[in-house]
Structure formats: structure tokens, C-alpha cells
Amino acid sequence: MADSDNDSGGHKDGGNASTREQDRFLPIANVSRIMKKALPANAKISKDAKETVQECVSEFISFITGEASDKCQREKRKTINGDDLLWAMTTLGFEDYVEPLKVYLQKYREVEGEKTTTAGRQGDKEGGGGGGGAGSGSGGAPMYGGGMVTTMGHQFSHHFS
């Protein structure tokens, strides 16, 4: 695995990046995959473009999460939840994204609830208690196949699994 994009976070420093710096960035393969979904099939993305977006999205995540973390600390809570992130986005001026993300978060919570409920029923049928893992009754696939969020003219999709 020494040659994977993930070892240096795919960043310009290559093998010279500290472990702490590597942890700051999303894996370049994930960033590239997301970028490709927004482009025509024959489009090419330069390494520099991937690295730039990688750094930007990682910084954005840190920015939003930091604000949400500050809120949780003030409220003496240890766990950041989706609502905290939406609050942080509003506070930091990204309110145009909040309503579509609320829809997305609601769908996600519904799917997670279905997975938990179905896993519990599956465990009861087998005589076990609760059950975990993939037990949604359909090979681990959730009952809701995916979500589509449209924000400022851009559509974002996610398949919950």
C-alpha cells in the first residue's frame, strides 16, 4: 500500500508530510471520485486540481466542525451531531446550504432508524437479541436507496448504505 494516494493524503509533499498533516486531508481518491461525478464522462482532472480541492474541502470541514465543537463545549456536550453542524454552517454564512442539508439529514436519520429496527427484528427471528452489522433484511442494503440534495443549482446525491 506504499504507493497509494492515501499515504501522503495525495498532497504535494509526498513522503515528507507529517502524520498530523496527512490526517488533515481527505483521501485523494475519494475527492477525485466526487469531482468526477460532477463532470462529463470524458472530462479529465489534473493532479493539481485534485490536490487543491482536497485541501479546500478538508479546510471547509475543519472550519465547520471547529465552530460546532465550540458550541458543544459551551453547552458542556462531548458529541457533535448533525444539527450542530447545520447551526455552524448558518453561523458562518453558509445558510443557503442548510435547508437542503436538513432534508438530507432527515432522510439519513430515517434510514438509520429503519436499519436499527430491521436489525432488531432480524435478531428476534433468529432468537438473538438485537443484532448488529448489516442485518437490514436485504443483504445489508437499506430500504431507502439514496438521497438527492439540490443546492444553488447543483445536485448532490448519496446512496445510503
Swiss-Prot record:
UniProt-listed InterPro entries: CBFA_NFYB_domain, Histone-fold, Transc_fact_NFYB/HAP3, Transcrpt_fac_NFYB/HAP3_CS
CDD domains: HFD_NFYB
DNA-binding region: 26-32
Gene Ontology process terms (BP): positive regulation of DNA-templated transcription; response to heat; response to water deprivation
Gene Ontology molecular function: DNA-binding transcription activator activity, RNA polymerase II-specific; DNA-binding transcription factor activity; protein heterodimerization activity; sequence-specific DNA binding
Main subcellular localisation: nucleus
Family assignment from sequence similarity: Belongs to the NFYB/HAP3 subunit family.
Keywords associated with the record: Acetylation, Activator, Cytoplasm, DNA-binding, Nucleus, Transcription, Transcription regulation
Tissues in which the UniProt entry reports expression: Ubiquitous. Expressed in seedlings, petioles, hypocotyls, reproductive organ tissues and leaves.
Quaternary structure annotation from Swiss-Prot or TrEMBL: Heterotrimeric transcription factor composed of three components, NF-YA, NF-YB and NF-YC. NF-YB and NF-YC must interact and dimerize for NF-YA association and DNA binding. Component of a heat stress-inducible transcriptional complex with NF-YA and NF-YB subunits made, at least, of NFYA2, NFYB3 and DPB3-1 in cooperation with DREB2A. Binds directly with DPB3-1.
Function: Component of the NF-Y/HAP transcription factor complex. The NF-Y complex stimulates the transcription of various genes by recognizing and binding to a CCAAT motif in promoters. Promotes the expression of heat stress-inducible genes by contributing to the formation of a heat stress-specific transcriptional complex with NF-Y subunits (e.g. DPB3-1, NF-YA2 and NF-YB3) and DREB2A at the promoter of target genes, thus promoting heat tolerance.
Domain of life: Eukaryota
Chain intervals for the UniProt region annotation (Subunit association domain (SAD)): 53-64
Residues the record lists as N-acetylalanine modifications: A2
GO CC, alphabetical: CCAAT-binding factor complex; cytosol; nucleus
PANTHER family assigned to the protein according to its UniProt record, in alphabetical order: CCAAT-BINDING TRANSCRIPTION FACTOR-RELATED, NUCLEAR TRANSCRIPTION FACTOR Y SUBUNIT BETA
Compositionally biased region (Basic and acidic residues): 8-23
Localization, UniProt: Nucleus; Cytoplasm, Cytosol
Residue ranges, compositional bias (Gly residues): 128-146
Induction profile: Enhanced by heat stress but repressed by dehydration stress.
Stretches for region Disordered: 1-23, 114-146
Protein name as catalogued: Nuclear transcription factor Y subunit B-3
